[in-house]
Amino acid sequence: MFQKLIVITFAIALASANIFDFLNNFNAGGRQQQNQGVRTPQEYESVVLNSQCDKYLCPDTGLCVEAPKFCPCPYPSSQIRCFLPDGRFVCISKPAGEGISEKYNDPKTNWKIDAKDDNIRDCGWVNRAWRGLV
């Protein structure tokens, strides 16, 4: 009787593991199909090496632009591009909050805004942090 109980428990555990493994693979497969981007370093290398770009290929987005300073942020609806004093740039999350986030919606001007408040992380804050003032 005890052996049958052990066998039944083992069979249920094995069946449950197979079902969860199937569901996990099923869900992962759906995500992979939605993600059209590069998945491995080899694929990334292939995309870069086979690019037809004769100017500058942005490493984060794969877009062909005139110069590195024209590369967009990977997530432009939620990020702003802040220029550093040395000419490079970093992408940071747009500041959020009531009455604040609307100021940062225009990509042509959002990098110029400085709230002059160290509690609001915008491009002004990035420049102050770069100079060691934060």
Curated annotation (Swiss-Prot):
Signal peptide (residue range): 1-17
Stored InterPro entries: LCL2
Keyword Signal: yes
Keywords from the UniProt entry: Signal
Keyword Signal: yes
CDD domains: LCL2-like
Domain of life: Eukaryota
UniProt-listed GO biological process terms: ERAD pathway
Function, in words: Probable component of the endoplasmic reticulum-associated degradation (ERAD) pathway.
Family: Belongs to the LCL2 family.
Name this polypeptide is given: Long chronological lifespan protein 2
Lineage start: Eukaryota, Fungi, Dikarya, Ascomycota, Saccharomycotina
GN (gene name): LCL2
